[in-house]
């Protein structure tokens, strides 16, 4: 089965892909939110207003931390967390070169990742 992830106002594509894959593996409905926007928005505020990031979208590491927090009170988020070991050995492909943080998360989850040799943005240099 092919699972996709795309950029939204809240999440980067890698983060969305991981959440969508966990939903599929856990039999969780696509429409179900695993992380409420009310949890994501303060993280975005922290990133942009206090830590100086320009991109408010959560990377995969930040989404996994948020998911683990939600899992304490939400059974569906807890079910999704239990699917993490099942990602090992799966294949993922990105049509752009991913940020190092997302590449690192895929590596730690033991997901086999390939990327097209195209940058996601024209901002090739970071402050």
Named regions from a protein language model:
Residues 1-55:
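Conserved mixed alpha/beta catalytic, RNA-binding, or beta-rich assembly cores of soluble enzyme
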């Amino acid at each position: 089965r092919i699972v996709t992830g795309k950029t939204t106002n809240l999440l980067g594509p890698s983060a969305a892909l991981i959440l969508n894959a966990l939903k599929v593996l856990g039999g969780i409905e696509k429409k179900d939110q695993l992380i409420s926007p009310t949890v994501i928005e303060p993280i975005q505020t922290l990133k942009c207003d206090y830590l100086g990031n320009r991109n408010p979208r959560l990377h995969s590491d930040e989404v996994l931390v948020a998911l683990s927090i939600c899992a304490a009170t939400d059974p569906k988020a807890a079910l999704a967390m239990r699917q993490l070991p099942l990602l090992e050995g799966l294949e993922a492909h990105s049509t752009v070169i991913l940020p190092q943080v997302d590449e690192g998360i895929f590596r730690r989850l033991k997901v086999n990742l390939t990327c097209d040799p195209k940058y996601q943005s024209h901002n090739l240099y970071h402050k």
